[in-house]
Amino acid sequence: MEVDSILGSLSITDDFDQLVDVTSLFDELCSKLKPEAIVKDPRFDLFEGTHSLEVNNSKLDSSLIELTAEEIEFDVNVAYDPPLASVAAIADRLLRCVISWLNDYQTLPTTVLSCRYTESLLSSLVKGTTAGSSWCTGNILYDKVLGSCILGVCYLTKFVQKLLSAGIVFEEEDLNFNNMGFNTFDNLPGQDVVINSLTESLQILEAYSDDSLHLTMLKHILKIIICLVHLEDHLTDYSTKTSHLDELIENANSVNGIFPQLQLSPPKGAFSTYIQKHRSNQFPPRKITKLPTDYSGFITLANDVKTILLVDKAESALETYQFAKFFNKLEQRHVIARILFPLFFIRDDRTVLGKFSYTQFYLLHVKEFSAQTPSEFESSIGNELIQESSNMLLEWYQNCSQNTCRYRQGFNRQLILWDSLQAQFESVNSQVYCSWTYFMKLSSMIEFSLKGFDLDIYKPFEAYSMFWYVYYLSHHLETFLKDSQNDIESNINAIHSMNKKLKKLKAGEKKDQLRLKYRFAMDNEMEQLQATKQFLNYLLKEINITKSLCLIEVFQFAILKSFGLIDNKNSTPSKFSNERLIHNLRFKPFNSIGVPELPEYEVFQQTLKDFVIEEKGAAFDIKLERATNFIETEVRNVVSSIDEIMQGIKGGDNNGVLVTGTRLVQELSLEYYCKLKHTSKALSVNSKVIVNTLKKNIKNKDSHEYKVELVHTTEGWNYFPIQTLRIKQDRYK
């Protein structure tokens, strides 16, 4: 009754006879809509009316934030008792705010800027103060020690702002920097002044005879802040020193050991939403963030930064390529590490790692892939095209550090650019450049497609089309790699044939010239040819693994379709779309790619029909058994190939068969292949479960009770989800 009365109060009029039923008119207009048309009245802009200013709405109007008496009356010029415990509690909470901001993707106003001391310091910078605390309590712990802590955290915040301004990651998506109108970070003193202030505070604490845990905690906090201030060195000096990162880990672990023994409680009002109410705030009000209970976030930060610094030890383009491919692949790295990687790698002096120009770095990739010296083919190519290719390569490297969603989006943009570059190289008859570009394009197309499964972009009914398409791409890449391998073999054999020819020639000028040519080839070409050959062996094994896993997924989909559980069409009917439109939309990123050409919609349909078992009775069982046996064979081959690759990685690429280039990311690459092996075995088990379950239930006519879901195994690789049977649930129960 109460609901009825509320709804009744919303009525336009009490005289319902005056109202007109427009349902039939609405249905009629809807039936005339074209699926591909955007519904918009031509008299209005597309987004007109979607923006509004909300006043007197407590959820949107920050001026309505209610503060407690303690929060309103809090005074930074008061030394709250007990001083040591209070200062330790404030500094501790501030550092955990930093962790929440940087590790948990929280906003600046609900973390670092929620501290009244931070606000006070930043406000004082407006007035021209460039160092020291802006408060005066008469207590050295508050005025000096806490002041240096706040100064250090503000300096770190300034460094993060600098990183964000580089445009590597996306604000609000990777990192929030709502500075509440504070444009004063540039007024902060330099790094030396900040570190000196923190060091002096440490000396003050060392003079204390108190051996309490609060004092120990505060010392560790100061050391942690010093380490955080030193993060800037990796960008300003391109430092590869990790001593401060090791100290950060050590002190964070020490704090984690002390933390449970302390009850830290900052003075009431020291952290609040005060700044959101009183400063320039263009965002809806938010509650203070729930903070982490330890300093593990700093350990993650330090370890991830240490990881990206390893790229400086790369000895070849292959090693930098594999490093970029793996360092952010298994899990998303800390946002600071992800920003630092491209800035450390691609430097302001327009060099890569301070060693190569952009063009040199690009040519190094082409050389190591083709085993040909750049001077042999560079002269015929225009500088503009080389520069464009160099920029494209560097963009690929930068994309590797993006968050997991933007990573796929970056490939989407790059596909058409790789294709365009390939076409331009073909027009000037540069096979070597063209081949490497084709390899990068196909690899990116495969990565882009499979990443969609990791992000749960595809519905179960789309699994067949996507896996078959990746199988199709893998086949093209496999063929290309075999051709490249044959070219390398021919070059190696040509050098060996010189030696045989030398033995047959009589002494003389002709033999001397051939001997010089042979020695030059052995000294300058053979090593690179052998390395390239072994790298191509690795790439062939890797693409065969991808190809086989996709084929297994295709077979499992076909088995499920053979039992009538799934189709490559959406089971939900729609007036505004059809199967061809949905298919074309899914494959739109590949539609403009010239080579390999995107198969027509009918080809996808026909290939699925070829995989599906249409026979009945005993013939059905025979074909089903063949399919499951094929899956078992493919899984064994995949596991065998993975084991060979892992042995090569563990052996440091010294087995004379495979070169993987994973020296700098050995543990990460081994973990990746372990996940891939686990997925392979899970797919094998799943095929048996599918067949046994459906064969048993089809006799009882219960197969219609199942649906198919794409499930990621806990220890597996998400690019290849398991097509799992689930019992249908009545959604209305």
Swiss-Prot record:
**Disulfide cysteine pairs (residue numbers):** none
Give the UniProt keywords, A-Z: Cytoplasm
For this record, an example GO cellular component is: cytosol
Q: Does the keyword Protein biosynthesis apply?
A: no
GO biological process, any: macroautophagy
Grouped into one coarse class, the protein's main location is cytoplasm
Conditions for induction: Glucose-repressed.
Q: What Pfam families does the database record attribute to this sequence? A: Mak10
Localization recorded for this chain is: Cytoplasm
**Family as reported in the entry's similarity comment:** Belongs to the MAK10 family.
How is the subunit organization of this protein annotated in UniProt? Answer: Component of the N-terminal acetyltransferase C (NatC) complex, which is composed of MAK3, MAK10 and MAK31.
Q: What else is known?
A: Present with 1970 molecules/cell in log phase SD medium.
Q: What does this protein do?
A: Component of the NatC N-terminal acetyltransferase, which catalyzes acetylation of the N-terminus Met of L-A virus Gag protein. MAK10 has a role in the propagation of L-A and M viruses, perhaps in the viral assembly. It is apparently directly needed for optimum respiration.
Q: What is this protein called?
A: N-alpha-acetyltransferase 35, NatC auxiliary subunit
Instruction: Give the source species.
Output: Saccharomyces cerevisiae (strain ATCC 204508 / S288c)
Q: Which gene encodes it?
A: MAK10
